[in-house]
Amino acid sequence: QALGISPRELEVLQLISQGLSNNEIAETLFVSESTIKTHISNLFVKLDVKRRTQAVIRAKEWCIIA
């Protein structure tokens, strides 16, 4: 994507939009919670947001997720 969002970051973003916690996302993707926090941090920079809800709203506005 033009924003440089990786496939894994997109997967994390979709799970955030479904209301999953960092721990739940980590368990779903079989990675550590620390890894998820890193992906979320990267997403915040790429989407220019500060909160999870803002990330989901921005991603929907930009048609990154449905």
What are these regions (language model features)?
Residues I65-A66:
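…primarily DNA-binding HTH/wHTH and HhH modules…
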Residues G19-Q54, E61:
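Recognition helix of helix-turn-helix DNA-binding domains
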Residues S6-R8, F30, R58:
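Exposed, low-complexity/repetitive linear segments and helix-based recognition motifs
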Residues Q1-L15:
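Regulatory hinge/linker segments at domain boundaries
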